[in-house]
Amino acid sequence: MTRSLSALIAIPVAISAALVFIVGPSMAQGTGGISALYPGDEGIEAHPSVIFVEQFEEGSIANIVPRWGDARNPNGMQFSSDVPPGSPPGHSLNIPWVGGGVNSGGHLYKVLRPGVNDTIYVRYYIKYPASGRYAHTGIWIGGANPVSEWPDPQAGSRPNGDDRFIAAGEQNNVINSFEHYDYWMGMHPDGTGAYWGNFLLNNPSVQAGKGQWTCVEEMVKLNNPTTAFNGEHALWLNGVKVSHLGPGFPRGLWSGGRFTQDPAGSPFEGFRWRSASALNINWIWLQNYSPDDPTGFSSTMLFDHVVVATTYIGCLGATGAATPSAPTNLRIVRSE
């Protein structure tokens, strides 16, 4: 269900720190997305490239869960009247957590049928709290073969290539910046030989601001043919592309499971997400997993305006994107 829109004024939302601009293949950015055609996302589900829309406007959480499929701790979820700038009045989804092992958050997981065999874009809004030790957050994108009706990340193990992959972007609690968290058959082990999600940006200035709404968009492009390393993964914050990796770009330096984008480094090898055509993009996973806070701590994480499409979506607003403030201290990383 979408919101009624009577009047809408785009409110600029700035990324909260200096950004690194990644110069890669030409890709839509800022005002070029399909959201420009649907102010406030009203009616965006009618666009032919849109696969799924969730605006959390049902009468109850119980009415939302069936549209997704699998849910963890739905009884702990709530609606909030706090919505992003550019949104018509309505609801966002609040996933709270309570420290000391009482409640570590919750999730909504959706299987995409049919699966996507080329490129997918997922845009959503998230409001991180001002404090708290959240671990995994946002919306992860991935594939499973065979299709799984519930999350099965198999944390700490490298995919074989015909079984699964994960492409994610989240505010990272290890390096305290917004970061990739990716599992694929070509991922690198950490210094101990273990396989945890690879960090692929490593720039402390790239932040999803705490206590404010952030528009996040991800693009995942599968490798075709399955023998190629031409898969890609890109991230936008508030309409600004902050990372884009693919075959031969950007340059950077590997250290264990971390790739730091740096023009003095070697070209990124590209993603071979899969080795079998039966594996495609077939799930999204909205989650707040926050198990590490002490007894007595409680906080909330808000989500809104989820759109899944096969073309770039862009942020909310009368022009289809929130206009970010001009960042400073830019560093240009050129692809070759």
Q: What is each stretch, according to the model?
A:
Residues A28-T214, E218-T319:
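Low-complexity, Ser/Thr/Pro/Gly-rich disordered linker/stalk regions
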Residues I9-G24:
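Bacterial N-terminal signal peptides
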Residues Q29, I313-N329, V333-E336:
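Low-complexity, Pro/Thr/Ser/Gly/Ala-rich linker/spacer regions in secreted
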Residues S4, N73, F165, I332-S335:
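Positively charged, low-complexity intrinsically disordered regions
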Residues M1-A10:
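N-terminal secretory signal peptides that target proteins for export/translocation
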